[in-house]
Amino acid sequence: MSTEKTSQASKEYQLKEADVKKMLVATTHLGVRNIDRRMQFYIFDRQKDGTFVFNLQKVWAKIVFAARILVTIDDPAEIAVVANRPDAQRAILKFCKYTHATAFPGRFIPGNFTNRMNPNYCEPRLLLVNDPVVDRQAILEASYVNIPTISLCNSDANLKFIDVAIPCNNKTPMSIGLIYWLLAREVLRLKGSISRTEEWDVKPDLFVALPEEIPDEEESEDFYDDDEEEDEEFSAGNGNLFDEY
């Protein structure tokens, strides 16, 4: 009986075909032409042009692992989510909207985690960043005060001070949006907020920033602080970006 329950539970966490198709459409599986030796474990193949290809099973496994870490934080507001890259700002704000984490879109102000005189000073229990290169300042400060760090990592990422790496294409809007959507969905599933057997009614399109929508740094938070009606209008106006080709 226990073996059957274990087998059933493991099937629930398996990567579904529908999610694989979404990842392929969003080019989540494509890295860059350079590679860090510690990222080789996540590589499936290499294209003729030199682009490394991620193993999607390993990508999914790290998404589930990261989600299980995120749900251990009793107060989600103590999770800091940082993204300096404009293409990722809508994604992290939507992620924080549904998981109640704290977003730091735009330039990360030095001293947010280490300088008590900083008006934005905070002491998060966990850090989630979009890019270990662009968001290096946040990672360094987290290492100074022993904050565990989860990061989306491309094939050339430096994993210094990164505790959990989610291998993926973290440079294009569709891939970034999809990863945060998958992560938010898994967090809500683990918390029991949504069913694992039913489709989440929030579409991944809502996490994707289109080029003409990328705001100025100081306007980013207000720009993306929209309600459900505006979300529906955005989705209807742009169709389903993750339709199969």
From Swiss-Prot:
Keyword Plastid: no
Biased composition range(s): Acidic residues: 213-234
Segments for region (Disordered): 211-245
UniProt keyword Cell inner membrane present: no
Main location: cytoplasm
Protein origin, superkingdom: Eukaryota
Pfam families (alphabetical): Ribosomal_S2
Record GO terms (molecular function): structural constituent of ribosome
Entry similarity comment: Belongs to the universal ribosomal protein uS2 family.
Main function: Required for the assembly and/or stability of the 40S ribosomal subunit. Required for the processing of the 20S rRNA-precursor to mature 18S rRNA in a late step of the maturation of 40S ribosomal subunits.
Protein name: Small ribosomal subunit protein uS2
Organism name: Giardia intestinalis (strain ATCC 50803 / WB clone C6) (Giardia lamblia)
